[in-house]
């Protein structure tokens, strides 16, 4: 009988700063060559589980351990981090924390340099893996010139060079555009088949992850494994809902169409599911009997106008933004999508005045070009993807009050505005808390509050739901919808096709610094050419429509959006 390569036996771990164990009585074996998906809500113990395997716990992060953990038949608590790194390779979720080279090539070559590999062999290895991860054209770029997704691919290439028998990827899809995420899963699958390595993928994005095949799924909740089963059996159970994880959209649509999902043999394979005549009949019947009107109306008077806006970095020959023409309308929820490096974040920074531009930007027919960053912040607020990059104060109240104090407002007036915004953001009860006591999602709301308190007309959010489990995803989006109802214009830069289709009234698609589409989300996702150009990927609802033979897939998508919104409001 094959011995497990990873074995947890009654294993518990408690951080010194925590009152209770983060992992509780974990019992699981993972065998050589297995590919395992690990899912769970924020704080469920997924990353702690992975860090116990790669050695960051206990060799870097200390805590109390009970039980046993064996890696490659060796007691994991008595080896060292260096030895563990020869067995376990890890791609971290925080790409900035893993990037150590001055260029992409230097970062990927780090291990080879330490192992004194000959330069010719080093260059061949780096070029080979850079080609595999789609970074061959960016090898000489500095880390600050790369997007979050590009940094992640560099980290992946650097780990793959090592060829460790165990590979852990912590949220590998979090910063990638949908098409690149799909290609990454295909790449990982090819690597797994070629090397027969043991692969553990920790992810929130269950639907996208299940594009790939997994031997097992481990589902975490409150530090415990509540499911250890096949993807199909997990989708049939109620465990995902119990753990606060969103099931694939097609599974929800099947239930809305009153399909008995428990009777489906391989629920994790959408193509197989849609071969059933019963499924085809039920879904088509649901479409025929239900109206799919799209009530989204976004056009009023333009609030923000961009005319022939260009941005060019000094060390790039081509413009990062190229003659962008764009109107943003009052009280709309606009999504901006595109491939990694398309210019999405650059566009936001150009609007805020962080970058020099050519062309013209107007706000309510008022020239924006001559205004300083501080003056523009009275009209436009920008919330960065990572809240830790924005927060500079120790206490919640002080962080939200920071901008008003910088404007010289009286403390009595600041108190009124800050407390009002904290109530709107659901943070009033925590107003005297330290920032470090907050979850990632709560920190995200603090950064939104720090922008909202300045009362801008437009709020730009870069990846508002990145890395969020379904509970916190809904929490953030419900909050943004409420702000929109109160009159704020919301611009969301996103890779999340669910967010795009369910929450925005209009979508602008960028590719290579240019606007290639400006229409409704459903029409964007129904256009295969646009999806290919911008590295988007149609959701499982579109795939379901095609497999079933629905001539107008957008009808199914719009029907699902309308019905799902109605269900969530109940």
Swiss-Prot record:
Main location (coarse class): membrane
Its biological purpose: Probably part of an ABC transporter complex. Responsible for energy coupling to the transport system.
Gene Ontology cellular-component terms listed: ATP-binding cassette (ABC) transporter complex
Domain ABC transporter: from-to ranges: 6-247, 304-537
GO MF entries: ATP binding; ATP hydrolysis activity; ATPase-coupled transmembrane transporter activity
Family indicated by similarity: Belongs to the ABC transporter superfamily.
Positions of ATP 2 binding: 338-345
Localization, UniProt: Cell membrane
Transmembrane segments: none
InterPro entries, sorted: AAA+_ATPase, ABC_Co_transporter, ABC_transporter-like_ATP-bd, ABC_transporter-like_CS, ABC_transpr_CbiO/EcfA_su, ECF_ABC_transporter_ATP-bd, P-loop_NTPase
Binding site for ATP 1: 40-47
Official protein name in the record: Putative ABC transporter ATP-binding protein SAS2569
EC numbers on record: 7.-.-.-
Entry-linked PANTHER family: ABC TRANSPORTER ATP-BINDING PROTEIN BC_2655-RELATED, HEAVY METAL TRANSPORTER
Membrane topology note: Peripheral membrane protein
Keyword entries, A-Z: ATP-binding, Cell membrane, Membrane, Nucleotide-binding, Repeat, Translocase, Transport
Top-level EC class as recorded in UniProt: translocase
């Amino acid at each position: 009988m094959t011995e497990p390569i990873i074995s947890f036996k009654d294993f518990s771990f408690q951080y010194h700063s925590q009152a209770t164990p983060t992992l509780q009585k974990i019992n699981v074996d993972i065998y050589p060559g297995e590919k395992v998906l690990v899912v769970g809500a924020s704080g469920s113990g997924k990353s702690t589980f992975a860090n116990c395997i790669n050695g960051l716990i206990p060799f870097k992060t200390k805590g109390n351990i009970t039980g046993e953990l064996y890696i490659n038949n060796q007691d994991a608590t008595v080896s060292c981090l260096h030895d563990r790194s020869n067995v376990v390779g890890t791609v971290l979720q925080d790409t900035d924390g893993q990037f150590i080279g001055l260029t992409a090539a230097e970062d990927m070559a780090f291990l080879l340099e330490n192992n004194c590999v000959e330069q010719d062999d080093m260059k061949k290895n780096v070029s080979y893996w850079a080609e595999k991860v789609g970074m061959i054209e960016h090898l000489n770029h500095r880390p600050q010139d790369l997007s979050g997704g590009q940094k992640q691919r560099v980290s992946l290439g650097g780990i793959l060079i090592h060829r460790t028998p165990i590979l852990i990827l912590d949220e590998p899809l979090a910063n990638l555009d949908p098409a690149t995420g799909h290609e990454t899963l295909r790449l990982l699958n090819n690597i797994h088949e070629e090397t027969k390595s043991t692969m553990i993928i920790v992810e929130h994005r269950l639907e996208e992850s299940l594009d790939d095949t997994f031997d097992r799924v481990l589902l975490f909740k409150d530090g415990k494994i509540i499911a250890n089963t096949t993807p199909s059996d997990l989708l049939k159970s109620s465990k995902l809902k119990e753990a606060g994880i969103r099931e694939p959209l097609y599974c929800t649509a099947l239930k809305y169409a009153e399909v008995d999902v428990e009777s489906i043999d391989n629920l994790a394979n959408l193509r197989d599911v849609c071969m059933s005549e019963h499924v085809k009949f039920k879904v088509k019947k649901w479409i025929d009997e239900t109206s799919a009107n799209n009530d989204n109306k976004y056009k009023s008077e333009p609030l923000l106008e961009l005319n022939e806006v260009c941005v060019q970095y000094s060390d790039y020959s081509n413009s990062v933004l190229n003659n962008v023409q764009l109107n943003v309308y009052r009280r709309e929820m606009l999504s901006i999508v595109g491939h990694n490096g398309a210019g999405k974040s650059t566009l936001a920074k150009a609007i805020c005045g962080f970058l020099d531009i050519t062309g013209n930007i107007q706000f309510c027919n008022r020239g924006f070009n001559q205004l300083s960053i501080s003056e523009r912040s009275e009209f436009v607020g920008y919330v960065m993807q990572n809240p830790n990059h924005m927060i500079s104060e120790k206490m919640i109240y002080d962080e939200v009050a920071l901008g008003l104090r910088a404007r010289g407002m009286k403390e009595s007036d600041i108190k009124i505005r800050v407390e009002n915004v904290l109530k709107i953001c659901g943070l009033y009860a925590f107003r005297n808390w330290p920032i470090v006591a907050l979850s990632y999602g709560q920190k995200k709301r603090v950064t939104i509050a720090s922008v909202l308190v300045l009362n801008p007309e437009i709020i730009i959010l870069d990846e508002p739901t990145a890395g969020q489990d379904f509970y916190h995803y809904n929490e953030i989006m419900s909050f943004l919808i409420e702000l929109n109802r109160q009159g704020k214009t919301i611009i969301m830069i996103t890779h999340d096709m669910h967010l795009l289709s369910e929450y925005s009234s209009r979508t602008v698609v960028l590719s290579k610094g240019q606007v290639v589409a400006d229409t409704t989300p459903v029409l964007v996702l129904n256009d295969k050419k646009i999806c290919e150009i911008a590295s988007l990927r149609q959701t499982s609802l579109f795939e379901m429509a095609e497999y079933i033979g629905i001539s107008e897939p957008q009808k199914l998508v719009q029907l699902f959006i309308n019905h799902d919104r109605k269900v969530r409001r109940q």
